Amino acid sequence: TLFRSPCEPRPWTEAERPATFVELHVEQGRHLVDVGQAVGVGSGIWPHGRFRFDFAGEANHAGTTRMEDRRDPMLTYAVTSLAANKQARLSGQRATFGRVEVTPNGTNAVPSHVTAWLDARCETEGTLDQLLSVITRQAQERAERDGTRLTVTTESVSGPVRFDAGLAARVAADHEGGAWPLIPTQAGHDAGILAEAGIPTAMLFVRNPTGVSHSPEEHAEPADCLVGVAALADTLERLAS
């Protein structure tokens, strides 16, 4: 435990504010695979928004209700999900409907209500606003066609996080193999919290061969991990000198 270690656990106070924070993390994508580098340096974190889409229709019998008589919110949601995917692909952003709740959620019932949550991540806040606007407009157009109703609620929006540019440039340049690439991340990290607190912060990413994250397939090769650890140790040694 911490009590048995040389470090005594105690509250972190403003008097103990760190001068710099550097985080080492596996890349949660495949940019480093594409550029053939074992390590990359984070430039910042994309803006991130979560939005609730409520689609209201009319519950009815799945067998006796003719297709043309239905007001099916599941159909409106399905078209909205496809629209979100298409718009994100066209603009190089991220849009995911990863959670859906259906009422009454019966095999033999046309739903009366569908709630779906959109996770959207974009390079800038303006791009995030634009992506949401396009998806919402297309969803509304489909709702009018389906005889359903749409309500969109913003649940949370996180602005961009910029890591210390001077520190990132120094970490990227000062190593034996040349310059590590600077890459943005679309995921939240501890480093982002500390950067927003005004602490000079940097991130090092280790190549992920699969590019997969939040899955058992996420991993990094031991050789790349060693390169990442060496880069972190070298960075900390230079910062402490």
What are these regions (language model features)?
Residues 3-126:
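Midchain, well-structured core segments that form catalytic/ion-binding scaffolds
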Residues 127-131:
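Solvent-exposed, non-transmembrane alpha-helical starts
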Residues 43-45, 61, 65-90, 132-137, ...:
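His/Asp/Glu-rich mid-to-C-terminal helical/loop segments that flank catalytic regions of hydrolases
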Residues 158-162, 178-184:
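Short, glycine/charged-rich beta-strand-loop motifs at protein surfaces that mediate ligand recognition
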Residues 112, 180-231:
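Zn-dependent metallopeptidase/amidohydrolase metal-coordination segment
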Residues 87-95, 143-149, 175-180:
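Short secondary-structure junctions
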Residues 96-106, 117-124, 149-168, 190-192:
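A short beta-alpha structural unit
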